[in-house]
Amino acid sequence: NIEVKAGEIVGIAGVEGNGQLELVEVITGLATPDQGQLLINGVNLTKASILERRKYMAFVPQDRALMGSCLNASIKENLIMTHYKLNPEFTRHGHILNDKKSTEFAYEIREKFDIQLHSIEDEMKSLSGGNQQKVILGRELLLSAPFILLDQPTRGLDVGSIEYVHQQIIRMSKENRAILLLSSDLEELFRITDRILVLHRGQIVANLITNETNINEVGYLMLEGAAHGA
């Protein structure tokens, strides 16, 4: 079982290929679990559609180019993804996109997340990797969902962008969001999480308080699936 409380940042540590992809797919609705339930704020989302889950869940995927964005679409279009399906203010007569609302919202995210761009009408691929990640983060975090799933959110980013992402994650936890962070960077997990769950061969083999463990212990658990000497 994985439980993440409101205001808590829980990290998932594990050697890649030990069930991380399957975990993300089950949580987001891309795969059906063999057993168990997915509950967010007491709402059973186990059989809910992907769109229904998005009312309760923000998701920053590992592959920002293929899953997190559409590089050939405009920055504005990327910023309103999901929002226009969940918020009726983004459409008129149920189908026509409200361009005024979409533009205002895009500029709001640009300001809040300090996205460096020339025009919101430019293609997403015109942005640096760090600014692309800011677009995805801004879009997802403004969903106001109680649960945030982050899959390798800083992979491939420069030091400044990594620090910015960490600040946003911590800010969201202070807003009482429950955050689950998958990362192959143990230093990242030790820097910002409250607890670390170790994933080994598809099973959670340890549930550790971050400031009561160390990188060596977590690393050993990742490799062996049990504590040293157990």
Model-derived features with residue positions:
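H-loop/switch region of ABC-family ATPase nucleotide-binding domains
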Residues: S183-S184
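Walker B catalytic motif
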Residues: Q152-P153
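Helical segment within the ABC ATPase nucleotide-binding domain
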Residues: E163-E175
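Conserved P-loop NTPase catalytic core
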Residues: V24-L127, A206-T210, N214-A226
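Conserved catalytic motifs of ABC-family nucleotide-binding domains
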Residues: S144
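A short, surface-exposed alpha-helical micro-motif characterized by mixed small hydrophobic
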Residues: L189-R191
